[in-house]
Amino acid sequence: MVAQQCVQHLLDFIDGSPSPWHAVASIESVLKAVQFVQLDESAKWQLHAGGRYYVIRDNSSIVLFVLGNKMPIESGFKIVGAHTDSPGLRIRPNGATSSDGFARLGVEVYGGPILATFADRDLSVAGRISFNSNEQILHKLVRFDQPLLRLPNLAIHM
């Protein structure tokens, strides 16, 4: 049963993380629940043996680490890495146009997606929007769970 629970937790994480920004927010909520301490990347850190810490950059990447009770020169250290983004299509800024009752969004390929898997199926939008509010740039996570888009597959002779 433990293996099934681990798989279910992973699937829940993947489903809840449609963008790097969502993934980092999900990871941060787990870290806070187990008493990790967030550090400011630009500040001098006060670290303690056995401490559990993390740093977030641009809300799209996260680094976490746990200090042992001995100095790394005595006990060594381990590093594990992963990335929170995945291949896909990203909406270009100011890339929206419309004509004949249809809206079109300019997109750019990010990473190395298998493009055929995006064609002729319902798609939606998730990510981070940035906007100006009272002379401040603010960011907000967005996720639309209903189908909004479709990329038509053109006939091979087109």
Please report, for each region that a protein language model flagged, where it lies by residue.
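N-terminal hydrophobic/helix-forming segments and targeting peptides
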Residues: 1-158
